[in-house]
Amino acid sequence: MAHAELATEQTLLREIGRTERNRRHIRGWLAVVLFALFALVLVGGATRLTESGLSITEWKPVHGVIPPLSAQEWEEEFRLYQRIPQYEQINKGMTVDDFKTIFWWEWAHRLLARGIGVIFALPLFFFWVTGRVERRLRLPLLAILALGGLQGFIGWWMVSSGLAERTAVSQYRLATHLTIACVIFAACMWIYRGLCPHSDDAPPTKASQKMAAVIAIFSLFQIYLGAIVAGLDAGLSYNTWPLMDGAIVPGGLFVQQPAWINLFENPKTVQFVHRLGAYLLLALVLWHMIAALRSAPETTHARRSVLLFALVVVQAAIGITTLLLQVPIGWGVLHQGGALVVLGFAIAHWRGFVGAYPKDTAIEVRA
């Protein structure tokens, strides 16, 4: 009996060790995916700010990997761009060399997106067939893969909105594209954090745990609002702070009918709502930090809440600076990257309350 118990214990320890090794491999893979997704969002922001997103007017998922390689191919690509309203109304007179600048931004964005599909799908397949993917992770990882495929279609759906009548993409489709990218990033972060070792600190209160979830979800919503701002160039509506046109609440916020359409199509209203969202997020993380410090000042949860507050303050400062400088490209990209950092940490913070995935220690003992 003692020998059987010892053998079972040794088998259990080996199984736990194998699970931990597999988790380290999965974490390493997801860390690479997260880094690539972060880079993709930054390149996407630069593509938008340089008005490069409509430079490639066709969607070729496979052949589009190869850029123009000869002068003739560049001329042909440029002729395609000259057919769309953006060229006729904004960039008429652009040279081929000028066109190459905006082309490379969009091409790099698409290439990086394709690359992420590869670095997600191939390792997932390998980990799956070698038994390294825990059963509880299979459906979430497949859902992320499917969402990534859908995101490719959404990207082209967004671009196509600016090829016929508009000189820029639809703000609705831009917001959808960015939000889905952030959902994919958040989902990868949630799984990554769930596979990391956690502290044994109990959550300060149930309310703190719920507030961590609210903050994470609202951070994503604030990114959606920011995408609407970007799609309308609403960041140029008012370039003063803290007042807007000399007032806390400026006029002309609801001049369009029906009134709700102003929330999506009136640049002044859109910027005002995005500002309010930033103030509300700052208030939420401040309240959350104070509550955590009062309830359990020495816990990792409290320390994370302090860091989250600091990140939101820095992001707010970046946003204000971007606004006052009238949205220069560098600051605009930094602001978009900062939003993703806040979202990622908010997700990790929330997951810290929930805890790590339990390890499967069930051992089948055969006679």
Swiss-Prot record:
Its EC number is 1.17.99.9. The chain crosses the membrane at residues 26-46, 111-131, 139-159, 174-194, 212-232, 272-292, 305-325, 327-347. Pathway: Porphyrin-containing compound metabolism; heme A biosynthesis; heme A from heme O: step 1/1. GO terms for cellular component: plasma membrane. SUPFAM superfamilies: Transmembrane di-heme cytochromes. Its cofactor is heme b. It is an enzyme of class 1 (oxidoreductase). Keywords: Cell membrane, Heme biosynthesis, Iron, Membrane, Metal-binding, Oxidoreductase, Transmembrane, Transmembrane helix. Pfam families: COX15-CtaA. GO terms for molecular function: metal ion binding; oxidoreductase activity, acting on NAD(P)H, heme protein as acceptor. It is found in: Cell membrane. It comes from the Bacteria. GO terms for biological process: heme A biosynthetic process; respiratory electron transport chain. Disulfide bonds: none annotated. It catalyses: Fe(II)-heme o + 2 A + H2O = Fe(II)-heme a + 2 AH2. Heme binds at residues 274, 335. It is a multi-pass membrane protein. The keyword Oxidoreductase applies. Catalyzes the conversion of heme O to heme A by two successive hydroxylations of the methyl group at C8. The first hydroxylation forms heme I, the second hydroxylation results in an unstable dihydroxymethyl group, which spontaneously dehydrates, resulting in the formyl group of heme A. Belongs to the COX15/CtaA family. Type 2 subfamily. Interacts with CtaB. This is Heme A synthase. The lineage of its organism: Bacteria, Pseudomonadati, Pseudomonadota, Alphaproteobacteria, Hyphomicrobiales.
